[in-house]
Each structure stands twice: as structure tokens, then as C-alpha cells.
Amino acid sequence: MKTIRTGMMTLAALAVLGTNVVSATSEPVKELSVNVNGQHIEQAAIFDKGQQTVLVPLRDVAESLGFQVKWNAETKAAEVNKGAIFSYAKVGEDRYPFAKMYKTLGAEPRLLNGNTYVPVAFVDEILQAEVNVTDDAVTVVDEESDVAPVRTGTITTLNKREDGGVSFQLNGYETGIILHVDKETKITTADGKELKPEDLQLGMEVEATHQKFMAMSMPQSGAVSIVVKSGLETPEVLGTAGKVASIDKDQEGSYKMLVEGQALAENAPEKVALIVGKDTKIVSAKDNKELAPEDLKAEMKVFAYYGPKLTRSLPPIGVAEKIVVE
């Protein structure tokens, strides 16, 4: 039996979050995006508060994994079949055929908006695929697929070459990966709008899938798909990566942080003083967890992003839009 990995937020924490989806019992549930073998699935997964588990749309997920799915009107069950694997999901029954016996998964299928939803454990234990669950996404990977699971995080460095090629670093130096973008890479916004490689910017939060092969030095791979979840407000993003030389809090509650290191954009300084306020987004490169200004300390390694409006002083002073902490 493989293990379903759950990161960033426990199922108990998911239970307190609501969304606009309505279940068969009219109880609000939490929506999660679904990605199978690098491809986004339009039908969202949901968190079933009553059963304390995530449910995924059976047909969309199973068919994306190469299974045949059909509805058996006589037994009132959704059947799945691929090779030696046959099973079914019947609403109201925690009982699933597998390898000439029955398994219980601790949760029952649900019928929502005319679609059969199954516990995420069904994908792992019955469909035999690798599953990763975070606070807002379910990633499914067929063990035979050449696509690695989705990585979510921030574009910390960005290299746009004269030949039109683009490569970027996701989530910093220590825990990140370098992804190469080519004409085959599918780039979209979260609502499905197509983007071009040149639309990528420093500080963007993205979901990226890549090929499983990676170089032996710092991990590098070709990006298969990129979904831009959010970007910074300024159209021209500057950035500086380095150590926090100092950070001080003023009487109004804002922080002033001095960063010394490497310029990440053509017009960016290597040394910059940044105002860190309530609108500054601060995240950890390791797990994308949101941090507070008071979590910033001297000597921390950071990637700081800001707009082009800087004072003419030395060092120049600006307003931090986003900070990624290594």
C-alpha cells in the first residue's frame, strides 16, 4: 500500500474552510484543484467535512489515468477497468472490489451535481496511482508517467534569453529547482487564459509540472505545464537576493529591511532598503507557508521583490511587494 502524502494543511484544518460548492446535504465544502499527470482537471475535488476526507471526481480522474469508466444502471455503481484492475464505487457503501476481495477506505462515495465522487484513498489504493494532497490541490501521478508531481511556489529567479528561451528558478536555491520553458510548455492563468513565456515575471506564484529526469547538480528539468496563480501588482518587477543585513520596526508598525546581495533584474540594485508593511506578502521557500513581518530576522537569506519606484539615496529605498525566505 502506498502512502497518500498530505502537506501544508491537515484535514482538520481544511474542515474549517468554506467555498461556494454545495453538497447533497447543502453543506458548504472546501474546493481543491486537481492535476493528473501534469494536466489540470476542470472538475474540482472537495473536502467532505462529514467524512473528514477529500473526495475527487471519479470519471475525470480515472479516465485521465487510462481507465474505462461506465455506469452500471442495474447495480447503481460507477465501474472502472484497466488491465487487471477492476472495481466500482457505489454511493453510500464503503466497500470497494480489489484483487478478488473487498477493501474499506474509511469513507463512502458521494453523488454531487450528478457526478460520482470517491475518497482520495480510492485513487491511491484502487487505481494504484501516487497521490499528493495539499491545502488547495490534489496531484495524481501514474507510476508509469514520465511527468513528476506538481510543484507549487514562487519564481525566484528568471532568465529570458535573446533567442526567446526562458528558464526560471522555483522556490530558491536550497529547496528549489530550475525549469526550462520551451514552445511545448503549456502556460496558462488559473482561469485558463493562455500565456507566453515572456509573460512570466519574478515573484509570480505558479504551479508547475516537469519531466521526471533532472540534472545531477542543482535539479533542472523541462517544464511541461505552468499555471500562474498570482503575480505582483507592479508591471515591472525588480528583485534582490541576499542576506538581511538589518531589520527594524518603526513606531507605526512597519518594518525597514536592508538586503545585500545579488540583483535579480537589469535595473535592480545589489543593496536595497525596503519598507515591509501589511500588504507585503512573505512566504517560506521550503513549503510556501505564509510568514509575518516579525518572522524576518537579520542574516536570513531572502529573495525580495519590489517596484521600480526607488529613492535616489544610497542605498535606494522602496516598498517590498513580496519576500521569499530560504
Swiss-Prot record:
GO terms for molecular function: serine-type endopeptidase inhibitor activity. Its main location: secreted. The keyword Secreted applies. Shows inhibitory activity towards serine proteases, such as trypsin, chymotrypsin and subtilisin. May form a trypsin-inhibitor complex in a molar ratio of 1:1. Keywords: Protease inhibitor, Repeat, Secreted, Serine protease inhibitor, Signal. It is found in: Secreted. It holds the Pfam family Cu_amine_oxidN1. Proteolytically cleaved to yield at least three forms (BBRPI-A, -B, and -C). Sequence repeats lie at residues 177-208, 272-304. It comes from Brevibacillus choshinensis. Residues 1-24 form the signal peptide. This is Protease inhibitor. Transmembrane segments: none annotated. Thermostable at neutral and acidic pHs. Residues 177-304 are annotated as: 2 X 32 AA approximate repeats.
